[in-house]
Amino acid sequence: MPLSPPVGRQHLHTRRVTCQGFFREDGLWDIEGRITDEKTYEHANEWRGPLKAGDLVHDMSIRLTLDHKFTIVDVEAVTDKSPYPICGEVAPDFKKLIGLRIGGGFHREVRARLGGVHGCTHIVELLGPVATTAFQTVFSGKARELNRAHRTRMGHEVKADEPAKPRPKPYMIDNCYAWAADGPVVKRWAPDFYTGPDADAVRAAAAGKEIEMPD
């Protein structure tokens, strides 16, 4: 259901965040984020002059390139629009994220490397939805299909007698109400990580079965 009807009000500001995930032909992943801000009225900017309604105050983007372990192997950050001429100077410093793995403690480490005056507030904030987009991309059914096809092309077929590797714990578990480890969603889609009262029976029934996570 949508939000309830609002009281009378005047629209002043719009922030848009767009994130996209891509599987690359070399088997890596590109996760891109863009953030824009605009006002609904004309206002002055000392550096850029008058900004009309709809002119972008901020327009900033970042691309993280990840390997299959969610380790960042390359970063590109750009500032196309900003309120101050020096804002874009910090963009190259986002290379400090190279080597960092998206997972537990990711945001804490981002703040340690790029917090305060060592980074751009808006691009740092953008890394939150970018990280979530990475998981949504890599754990999708289509992504698994593309990854298997790539491995086959590269001669990395899995042999029939090769034991299956245990899958990593899905990031969503215990990070969302619906994905509580003892709840029905985990029981259905990730029974190997289910912790409900009938966990032993559920895990035993799922042993050896490949369960495709929903997109």
Residue ranges of predicted features:
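Active-site- and interface-proximal helix/loop "cap" or "latch" segments in soluble metabolic
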Residues: T14, G21-F23, I35-D215
